[in-house]
């Protein structure tokens, strides 16, 4: 989180988002800086950090493995990693303001057709963030995403067999923290080769 992004840390960059995969070293401290963009943070490992803002506020943060958080941009601060081990974090920077359009959720919305395994982690004017749980070799119900675009990030290495309406079936292999970009509405379903959780960030 505090390391200066190297070119190979940028895993996805388009008109909508820039996604960074960062490995923070123990005891890392940053100079005074700000993040211009609002971000969705996905913690792949436990983290204990302290943020010291220019206005004097001190914010001690404790994050669990797999936790997801909203991080608004704009405030000048320094950061310090209090951990004695490395920690991986995925940062999804949002490049655009909300579209202002009503968020579309139809009858086949994943939260409706698979409510046991798909939960809304949080939602605001910019995003709806879903936590999707897959059992090994169990196909999820066919469902639809009607929003403009989305980023999917697995919390573990996984192979997914994906069935998409109007397209050929395909197999997708993703490493933990590797983002996958999808644009436009889609009707699909997936089956994972292992028990896994995926974080889906739907853009508004």
Across the structure, where does each feature detected by a protein language model lie?
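Flexible, surface-exposed loop/linker segments and immediately adjacent secondary-structure boundaries
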Residues: 74, 85-90, 94-110, 114-116, ...
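Extended, hydrophobic interaction surfaces within ordered domains
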Residues: 49-99
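Glycine- and acidic-residue-biased ligand/ion/polar-headgroup-sensing regions
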Residues: 36-55, 146-166
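Short beta-strand segments in beta-sandwich/barrel cores
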Residues: 30, 47-51, 68, 140-141, ...
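Short acidic-glycine-tyrosine-enriched beta hairpin
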Residues: 12-16, 55-73, 166-185
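A short glycine-rich, His/Asp/Glu-containing loop-to-beta-strand
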Residues: 6-32, 36-44, 92, 112-152, ...
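Ligand-binding loop in jelly-roll beta-barrel domains
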Residues: 73-95, 148, 157, 183-204
């Amino acid at each position: 989180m505090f390391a200066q992004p190297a070119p190979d840390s940028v895993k996805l960059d388009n008109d909508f988002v820039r996604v960074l995969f960062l490995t923070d070293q123990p005891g890392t401290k940053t100079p005074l800086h700000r993040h211009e963009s609002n971000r969705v943070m996905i913690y792949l490992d436990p983290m204990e950090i302290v943020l010291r803002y220019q206005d004097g506020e001190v914010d001690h943060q404790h994050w669990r493995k797999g936790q997801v958080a909203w991080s608004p941009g704009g405030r000048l601060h320094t950061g310090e990693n209090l951990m004695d081990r490395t920690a991986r974090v995925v940062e999804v920077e949002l490049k655009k303001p909300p579209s202002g359009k009503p968020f579309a959720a139809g009858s086949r919305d994943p939260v409706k057709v698979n409510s046991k395994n798909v939960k809304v982690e949080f939602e605001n004017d910019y995003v709806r963030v879903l936590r999707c749980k897959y059992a090994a070799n169990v196909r999820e119900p066919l469902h639809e995403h009607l929003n403009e675009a989305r980023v999917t990030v697995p919390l573990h290495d996984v192979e997914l067999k994906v069935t998409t309406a109007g397209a050929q079936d395909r197999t997708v292999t993703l490493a933990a923290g590797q983002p996958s970009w999808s644009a436009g509405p889609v009707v699909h379903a997936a089956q994972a080769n292992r028990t896994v959780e995926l974080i889906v960030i739907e853009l508004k």
